[in-house]
Amino acid sequence: VAVAGGHNLIMIGPPGSGKSMIAKRIPGIMPSPTLEEFLDILRIHSAAGQTMNGGLRFLQRPARAPHHTISDVGRLGGGTIPGPGEISLAHHGVLFLDELPEFKRSALEVLRQPLEDGHVSISRSAGKITLPCHFMLVAAMNPCPCGYLGDPKHECRCAPAQIQRYRARISGPLLDRIDLHIEAPALSI
């Protein structure tokens, strides 16, 4: 449903519940980009000095998965000569944020406006640019710091206050921009 409608998605579940595996499969089931979308993708990647190698790149949309330690410039774009960051490189594709609460709160808050508007404006001394960033946000997180809240096979070691602080790292306004919230139960294999 999320892929068909291009809805932003967050998956909450313990380690090993398949959250990351599902997120990595999403670009492969998205419809191929139109020619116009593909040209947009090429322009952005070219502006970042990246190439789209291989014939299969035409069939799939971009999938970006930045680490939670990424800099603001790497995430949003910028630099001395402004250029695209991860959110623009995910344009017409997927931006996967694994372990969402591990990202700095300020790093998550700056996603709100681009998610709403579909573009990001970057102002630097060398100039101002506006880059497109219409992407499907896919996020994953554990239900608590230890990861095992609600897992029938593991005991959660977290105090209620720890769980509350952990979940408070993600603001209500950001969660409001995520259309589908899914609980991913532990898998028994």
Predicted features by range, described:
Residues 67-68, 83-116, 148-151, 171-175, ...:
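Conserved AAA+/SF3 P-loop NTPase catalytic/coupling segment centered on the Walker-B
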Residues 40-42, 148-189:
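Conserved AAA+ ATPase core "coupling" helix
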Residues 98-100, 125-126, 139-144, 161-162, ...:
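A short beta-strand-to-loop transition that corresponds to the Sensor-1 phosphate-sensing loop
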Residues 1-6, 14-15, 87-90:
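Phosphate-binding P-loop
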